């Protein structure tokens, strides 16, 4: 946080007279304007239409400030540009351009009323006269600090709200299961949390038909010929593409535990060798998803050379991955090339992450006639696809909560990952096993080091871990401690 510079804090700005539309935010906005407390809210809906920016007027008119936390600088800029058209000089933008700009923004944020829009680092900023904070898509990876002590914006803002007295709303299509488990009040914004979805059943396609179905290619071609943008979503790595039998079209899976697998020799969950198709015994499989460059080639064969490009190149048909969604302009058509591949893996967050990514992809689709998200899948009746079709994430996430409790995974229990890079002190395993109330698992190999997991009720273990980490660092080891890690 920049230093306190009281003599440089500017005077307040007059609030424009703006009509307040109806919104799920209405109740908490009214209470925030009257300095009344409201329960923490999980507002389930489409924040990217930005119509909700006009609903915060009563808070600003009451002389109080509003903080909006977005996951990326690109999204901060998009929101701030739209907000400035309504609220003018009240808008304070913190996109992390440079220290001088951030300090100037911090000075402005001290003179309410202000609409402060910033990246996750602003969650720790003192905001003058803060009455309402809105956090967008708190489940995103960017909302958690990768460096020790790995603070999460969700936990930081909940603590600040309780201590400082401002009201707090988490707004997005898929609230995290941690937020639901914490008892946040769930409110739906509109009938659907994301735009319309079309499902393409890939079991109808003949083997060797390619990574994109004929229906998807036709939709991509028609949309682009109409001058509208298309985004084709795929995986970062080829090993995460699903595979199906070329004879019976059944998805490839482990014969022992049933885990769906891609191009691997053994099951990542139980270690069993992956052999022939479980359904028919056939030994030939084909990939249903691939890396961006190969999708571009397939689209170009249909539409002509140069028709598709890999993000961040500009064109009517853009192919990219999750990391490209933040700066993506709104599109008329989005295509998820391999929905089934999104469920590959053994991490306890896999199912929640799949829904979150697809919902986020859906929010990139603009409102309008014929605009939609296409999901390609060989399991059209799966719970994930059914949830996307219905536009309501809550039943799916409640089921994830039950599964987490059954597996004793967060938020049903606590989990800490301890990573040591470089030379590992000999007594690490013994030290971790001695922590009271903790079950120590590991180590497993990670890049340049080892990782251990601690699970259980970790209140006393956290206290005991601190001197151990200090001792290991004094010994010369590089130690990273991650509470409730994402990639496990």
Where are these regions (language model features)?
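Cys/His-rich short segments
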Residues: 216, 222-302
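Hydrophobic alpha-helical scaffolding
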Residues: 170, 206-210, 285-289, 348-351, ...
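Active-site-flanking beta-strand signature of metal-NTP-handling nucleotidyl enzymes
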Residues: 196-201, 268, 278, 335-336, ...
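Accessory, non-ATPase domains that flank or precede helicase/AAA+ motor cores in DNA-metabolism machines
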Residues: 1-198, 202-205, 214, 221-236, ...
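C-terminal helicase module of SF1/SF2 nucleic-acid helicases/translocases
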Residues: 175, 211-228, 298, 302-488
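Structured core elements
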Residues: 134, 169-170, 231-233, 244, ...
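Short hinge/gating elements
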Residues: 138-139, 143, 278-285, 338-346, ...
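Amphipathic alpha-helical segments in well-structured domains
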Residues: 150-154, 292, 296, 351-355
């Amino acid at each position: 946080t920049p230093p306190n510079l009281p003599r440089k804090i500017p005077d307040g700005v007059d609030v424009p007279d703006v009509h307040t539309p109806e919104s799920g935010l209405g109740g908490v906005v009214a209470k925030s304007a009257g300095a009344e407390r409201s329960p923490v809210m999980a507002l389930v809906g489409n924040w990217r239409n930005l119509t909700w920016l006009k609903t915060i007027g009563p808070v600003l008119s009451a002389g109080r400030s509003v903080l909006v936390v977005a996951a990326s600088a690109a999204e901060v800029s998009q929101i701030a540009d739209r907000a400035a058209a309504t609220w003018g000089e009240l808008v304070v933008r913190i996109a992390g351009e440079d220290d001088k700009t951030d300090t100037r923004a911090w000075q402005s944020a001290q003179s309410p009323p202000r609409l402060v829009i910033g990246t996750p680092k602003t969650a720790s900023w003192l905001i003058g006269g803060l009455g309402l904070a809105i956090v967008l898509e708190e489940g995103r990876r960017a909302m958690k600090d990768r460096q020790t002590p790995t603070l999460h914006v969700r936990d930081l803002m909940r603590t600040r709200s309780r201590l400082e007295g401002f009201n707090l709303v988490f707004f997005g299509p898929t609230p995290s299961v941690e937020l639901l488990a914490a008892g946040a009040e769930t409110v739906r914004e509109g009938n659907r949390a994301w735009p319309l979805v079309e499902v393409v059943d890939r079991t109808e396609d003949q083997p060797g038909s390619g990574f994109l179905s004929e229906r998807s290619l036709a939709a991509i071609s028609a949309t682009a010929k109409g001058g509208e943008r298309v985004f084709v979503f795929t995986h970062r790595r080829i090993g995460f593409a699903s595979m199906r039998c070329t004879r019976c079209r059944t998805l490839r899976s482990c014969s022992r535990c049933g885990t769906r697998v891609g191009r691997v020799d053994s099951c990542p969950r139980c270690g069993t060798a992956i052999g022939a198709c479980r359904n028919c015994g056939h030994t030939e499989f084909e990939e249903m998803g691939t890396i961006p460059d190969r999708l571009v080639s397939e689209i170009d064969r249909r539409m002509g050379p140069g028709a598709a490009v890999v993000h961040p190149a500009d064109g009517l048909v853009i192919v990219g991955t999750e990391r490209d969604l933040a700066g993506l302009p709104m599109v008329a058509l989005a295509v998820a090339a391999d929905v089934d591949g999104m469920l590959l893996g053994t991490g306890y967050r896999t199912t929640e992450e799949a829904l979150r990514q697809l919902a986020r992809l859906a929010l990139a689709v603009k409102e309008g006639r014929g605009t939609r998200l296409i999901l390609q899948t060989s399991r059209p009746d799966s719970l994930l696809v059914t949830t996307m079709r219905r536009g309501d994430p809550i039943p799916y996430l409640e089921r994830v909560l039950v599964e987490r409790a059954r597996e004793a995974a967060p938020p049903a229990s606590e989990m800490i990952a301890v990573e040591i890079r470089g030379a590992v002190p000999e007594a690490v395993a013994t030290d971790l096993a001695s922590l009271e109330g903790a079950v120590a698992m590991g180590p497993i190999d990670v890049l340049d080091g080892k990782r251990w997991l601690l699970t259980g009720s970790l209140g006393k273990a956290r206290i005991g871990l601190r001197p151990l980490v200090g001792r290991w660092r004094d010994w010369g080891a590089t130690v990273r401690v991650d509470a409730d890690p994402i990639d496990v």
